[in-house]
């Protein structure tokens, strides 16, 4: 066999490579990029003018869509209360915080008051009540005026009427008539005649007080002046004053009546 020379083998290898590359041109990426870029640069430099780089305008950013998509709104942010608070100015937030603090303070005060009222309304322990009930109540001693009041209630069940003020002469007449004949001029008869309670007649008869002659004379003058004044007033009007039944009673007339009754018998 013939030995192939190195030149012949090199030419064969190069021919095979050319054939293979001509049918399927396999060029490296770098070579292809460089070739394309060079051709593009040449074509651009020749056919189209050079473009200078300029910064993008603000309109581009305003018209362009945001790169980051907006976050989804939560339920709290979508609520009307959140929107109203977001639209409020900053001063209103401070006022709202103050009002919230005031509401909290008022709520705490009201709760404290209610707790105090509940404590005050809580009934006391039954021990104190049982101790008070167990102690026997001693009979309270009555004072003298209370004893007298009870006695007067028994004596006057209908109530106490004020004493009728009588003329001093009538008082003397009552005493004198009772001394003359106690059976006829008894206490009920004198009370009915002078329109006074029986107790008042009893006290008049029991009393032994008598005025001095000077006091009696002054009293008579005063009562005489009073009688004349009343009579003059009534006479001016044209009315005759009414005289009670005991006005005609006097010691002499009483004695005369007694004598007549005795003589007739």
Swiss-Prot record:
Keywords, ordered alphabetically: Mitochondrion, Transit peptide
Cellular localisation: Mitochondrion
Biased composition (Basic and acidic residues): 95-106, 131-143
GO cellular component, one term: nucleus
Transit peptide feature range: 1-68
Xref: Pfam families: Neugrin
InterPro entries reported for this sequence: NGRN/Rrg9 (IPR010487)
UniProt-annotated stretches for the region Disordered: 69-167
Biased composition annotated in UniProt, kind: Polar residues: 72-87
Source domain of life: Eukaryota
Family: Belongs to the RRG9 family.
Function description: Required for respiratory activity and maintenance and expression of the mitochondrial genome.
UniProt-recorded name of the protein: Required for respiratory growth protein 9, mitochondrial
Gene source species: Blastomyces gilchristii (strain SLH14081) (Blastomyces dermatitidis)
């Amino acid at each position: 066999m013939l030995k192939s020379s190195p030149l012949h083998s090199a030419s064969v290898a190069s021919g095979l490579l050319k054939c293979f590359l001509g049918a399927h041109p396999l060029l490296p990426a770098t070579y292809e990029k460089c070739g394309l870029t060079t051709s593009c640069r040449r074509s651009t430099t020749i056919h189209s003018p050079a473009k200078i780089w300029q910064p993008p305008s603000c309109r581009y950013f305003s018209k362009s869509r945001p790169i980051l998509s907006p976050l989804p709104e939560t339920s709290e942010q979508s609520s009307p209360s959140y929107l109203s608070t977001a639209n409020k100015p900053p001063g209103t937030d401070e006022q709202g915080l103050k009002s919230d603090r005031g509401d909290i303070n008022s709520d705490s005060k009201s709760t404290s008051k209610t707790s105090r009222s509940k404590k005050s309304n809580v009934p006391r322990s039954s021990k104190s009540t049982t101790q008070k009930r167990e102690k026997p109540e001693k009979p309270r001693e009555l004072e003298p005026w209370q004893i007298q009041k009870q006695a007067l209630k028994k004596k006057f069940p209908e109530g106490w009427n004020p004493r009728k003020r009588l003329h001093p002469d009538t008082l003397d007449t009552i005493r004198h008539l009772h001394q003359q004949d106690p059976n006829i001029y008894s206490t009920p008869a004198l009370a009915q005649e002078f329109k006074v309670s029986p107790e008042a007649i009893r006290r008049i008869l029991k009393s032994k007080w008598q005025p001095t002659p000077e006091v009696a004379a002054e009293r008579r003058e005063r009562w005489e002046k009073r009688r004349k004044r009343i009579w003059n007033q009534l006479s001016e009007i044209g009315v005759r004053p009414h005289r009670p039944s005991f006005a005609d009673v006097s010691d002499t007339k009483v004695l005369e009546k007694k004598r007549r009754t005795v003589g007739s018998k």
